[in-house]
UniProtKB/Swiss-Prot annotation:
Domain of life, source organism: Eukaryota
Assembly: Interacts with lipid droplet proteins.
GO BP term (any one): cellular response to misfolded protein
Similarity field: Belongs to the IML2 family.
Major localisation: cytoplasm
Keywords per UniProt: Cytoplasm, Nucleus, Phosphoprotein
Protein name: Inclusion body clearance protein IML2
Source organism per UniProt: Schizosaccharomyces pombe (strain 972 / ATCC 24843) (Fission yeast)
Function: Inclusion body (IB) resident protein that interacts strongly with lipid droplet (LD) proteins. Involved in LD-mediated IB clearing after protein folding stress, probably by enabling access to the IBs of an LD-stored soluble sterol derivative that acts as a chaperone in inclusion clearing.
Length: 563
C-alpha cells in the first residue's frame, strides 16, 4: 500500500474504534477519536454523534447541527470516493472507493430520518429522495457482491484490511436489511406506492440480510447494531402478534436460542455497554422469565446512569412494563413516575400508566393509599392532553373525560380514581400484548370477572376482550369463540378499538384451534381482513395493522404450503 492508502486506512480504523466505543457507552472517548482528524471518515463519526444527540433530545437546534454535519461529511466522502475510483485506491479487497459509498449511504439514511422528524412536507419529500439514493447505492453494491457477503467471512491476514472488509460487508447488509424490513411493516397501500419506485418489502429477505452480519461478525459495530435492531423487531412487532409459525428453531415465532448465543458474544465484546443487559432483559421477558428480567434491569438501575440518557429511559420503561405484567403494581407505578422525570415529552402516558398500576394495587391488595395516588395522577391529565393527537393521548383524553363526567353526575365528590370502571391496566397490558410474556401462574392472577360499581356496557366490552385473551393464552381457546362473537356483533360503542381487536382475536382463535387445516386458515384470514378494514374511531389502529400484517404474512405462507 502507498503512504496515502496507509493514512486513509489508519483514519478509517480510528473511526471504527470510535463507533465501537459508542456501543460501550463511551461517548467522550468516541467523540475524542472522531475529533482527532479531519478526514471524511472522522467527519462521518462526528455526524453520527450529532445524529444520536439530536434523536435523543429532539431539540430543533440539534437536528439542524446534525444535518449540517451530515452534509459536510457527505461532501467530503463524495470527494474521497471520486478520488479513490480515479486513482484505483483500495482500502478493502472490494471495489476502490466502496467504503466511502457505504458511508455515504449511511449518511443519507440518517439525513432522511432527520427529515422525517420535521413537520415540513418539503423536508419529508427530500427525505424520500435521499432514501432512494441510499437504496440505489446499496442495491448496486449488493448486485456486485451479495454472493460474497452471504458466504463466510475470510481473513486477509491484515487486521486493518479485515476491518475495512467487515465495514463494507456488515454495513451494506445492515442498511439493506433494515431499509427493507421497515418498508415491509408499512401499511399495505403505502407499500404499493413505494413498490412503484422500486422499493421492495420482502420481510424474510430483510431478516436474512440482518442476521448475516450478526452471525458472521457479531462483535463488529454494524453487526451489533443489526443484532440490536433484530431484538427490537422481535420484542416489538413480533411480540405484538399472536399468530406465528412454530418450528424447532423458532418455538415462539422467533429464534430464541440463536438470540441468546449471539448476545453472549456481543456482551463479551462490549462489557461496559448498558444496551446489552437491557437486551438480555428483553429476551428473558420474551421467554416468560420476567422475574429474571427484572433482576437484570434493577442491577442496571442501581448503577450510575448511562451517558446516553435515552438508554436510561429505555431501561426504566422496560422495568415498568415487566413489573406491570408480573403484578408488581407499586414497583411498576414508581418506575413509570421516574420516567416522567427522565422524559417529559410523554408525561401523560407515564402518569396514566402509573395511575392504572396504583388502582390495580387497590383492587388486589386493598391499598387505600394507592387510591389517592391514582386520583392525584389522573386529575391533570385531561388538560395535559387536550390538544394532543397521538393515539395514546387521544385514548387517555377520552378515558379521563369519561371519569370527569361520571364524577360530575355524582356531585363532584371524591377523586377520579373512584369512578373508574374496568381495569385500565388490563387494557394497557393488552395494547402491549403483555399476556404473551406471561406464565400460566401469572395469567391466572388476572381477575377477569370483577365488576366495578361504575362499570358500564362499554367497560363490559373491554372486559370481555381481556377475558377472551387471557383464556386463549391459558390454552382454553374453545371458550373464547362465544365471547368474541358477542363483541364482534356490537355496532355502537365508545370502545371501538376493543371491537376491532375482537375480530383480530377471533382470527387468532381460529389459527390456534384449526390452523393446520385450509378451512381454519381461510376463516382466520377473513377475520384478519375484517380487523384491518374495521375503521371507525380506533385509537390503536396502527398497532392493530401491525399485528394484522404480520399475521397475514404467516397465514399466507401456511396456505401456500398447502396448495
Amino acid at each position: 500500500m502507498s503512504k496515502s492508502q496507509e493514512q486513509r486506512l489508519q483514519n478509517f480504523v480510528t473511526v471504527i474504534q470510535g463507533l465501537n466505543d459508542i456501543l460501550d457507552d463511551k461517548m467522550d472517548e468516541a467523540t475524542e477519536k472522531f475529533k482527532s482528524g479531519n478526514s471524511s471518515f472522522h467527519l462521518s463519526g462526528q455526524a453520527v454523534v450529532a445524529f444520536i444527540q439530536a434523536v435523543l433530545t429532539f431539540e430543533p437546534s440539534r437536528f439542524k447541527d446534525s444535518q449540517n454535519r451530515i452534509d459536510i461529511a457527505i461532501k467530503a466522502l463524495s470527494a474521497d470516493k471520486d478520488d479513490a475510483s480515479k486513482n484505483n485506491t483500495f482500502l478493502s479487497t472490494f471495489d476502490p472507493g466502496v467504503e466511502y459509498r457505504v458511508s455515504i449511504g449511511l449518511m443519507l439514511l440518517l439525513s432522511a430520518l432527520i427529515g422525517f422528524c420535521s413537520e415540513s412536507i418539503v423536508t419529508s419529500v427530500k427525505s424520500v429522495y435521499k432514501l432512494r439514493k441510499a437504496h440505489s447505492i446499496f442495491s448496486k453494491i449488493n448486485k456486485r457482491h451479495f454472493d460474497h457477503f452471504s458466504a463466510a467471512f475470510h481473513s486477509t491476514g491484515r487486521s486493518d484490511v479485515d476491518l475495512a472488509n467487515e465495514y463494507v460487508q456488515t454495513g451494506t447488509l445492515l442498511c439493506t436489511g433494515l431499509f427493507t424490513l421497515l418498508i415491509s411493516l408499512l401499511p399495505p397501500k403505502m407499500i404499493t406506492i413505494l413498490n412503484v419506485f422500486g422499493y421492495k418489502g420482502d420481510r424474510d429477505w430483510a431478516l436474512q440480510c440482518m442476521w448475516m452480519p450478526a452471525l458472521q461478525r457479531p462483535t463488529s459495530f454494524f453487526a451489533a447494531v443489526a443484532f440490536a435492531a433484530l431484538i427490537q423487531y422481535y420484542s416489538g412487532a413480533v411480540q405484538l402478534c399472536s399468530i406465528y409459525k412454530k418450528t424447532p428453531e423458532e418455538p415462539d415465532g422467533w429464534p430464541d436460542k440463536r438470540c441468546f448465543e449471539i448476545l453472549e458474544k456481543v456482551e463479551k465484546a462490549h462489557p461496559d455497554g448498558p444496551m446489552w443487559p437491557l437486551h438480555r432483559a428483553k429476551l428473558l421477558s420474551m421467554v416468560k422469565k420476567q422475574d429474571e428480567a427484572i433482576v437484570v434491569l434493577e442491577e442496571l438501575m442501581a448503577k450510575p446512569p448511562p451517558r446516553l440518557k435515552q438508554l436510561e429511559v429505555l431501561i426504566v420503561f422496560e422495568h415498568a412494563l415487566d413489573c406491570a405484567f408480573s403484578h408488581r403494581y407499586v414497583d411498576g407505578a414508581n418506575s413509570f413516575l421516574k420516567l416522567s422525570s427522565l422524559n417529559d415529552s410523554s408525561t401523560a402516558l407515564y402518569s396514566y400508566f402509573a395511575a392504572a398500576c396504583f388502582l390495580q394495587d387497590v383492587h388486589v391488595n386493598a391499598n387505600v393509599e394507592a387510591l389517592e395516588k391514582a386520583s392525584k395522577l389522573l386529575e391533570p391529565l385531561h388538560d395535559l392532553v387536550a390538544n394532543k393527537t397521538a393515539p395514546l393521548d387521544v385514548h387517555i383524553r377520552r378515558k379521563v373525560g369519561k371519569l370527569i363526567k361520571r364524577r360530575a353526575s355524582a356531585g363532584n365528590q371524591g377523586g377520579l380514581a373512584e369512578y373508574v370502571g374496568f381495569s385500565p391496566l388490563y387494557e394497557l397490558v393488552y395494547v402491549w400484548n403483555g399476556f404473551r410474556r406471561m406464565t400460566d401462574d401469572e395469567l391466572s392472577k388476572f381477575d377477569v370477572e370483577r365488576m366495578e360499581p361504575w362499570q358500564d356496557q362499554d367497560d363490559d366490552i373491554c372486559q370481555a376482550l381481556i377475558k377472551a385473551t387471557v383464556l386463549r393464552n391459558l390454552g382454553r381457546t374453545d371458550e373464547v369463540f362465544p365471547i368474541l362473537q358477542k363483541i364482534c356483533a356490537v355496532t355502537r360503542t365508545t370502545e371501538t378499538w376493543a371491537v376491532a381487536f375482537a375480530h383480530y382475536e377471533m382470527a387468532v382463535a381460529f389459527f390456534e384451534s384449526n390452523g393446520s387445516k385450509k378451512e381454519g386458515l381461510k376463516h382466520c384470514d377473513a377475520y384478519l381482513r375484517k380487523a384491518r378494514d374495521f375503521g371507525g374511531d380506533n385509537e390503536f389502529e396502527s398497532r392493530l395493522i401491525i399485528r394484522v400484517q404480520l399475521a397475514r404474512h404467516v397465514v399466507r405462507k401456511c396456505l401456500q404450503s398447502m396448495s
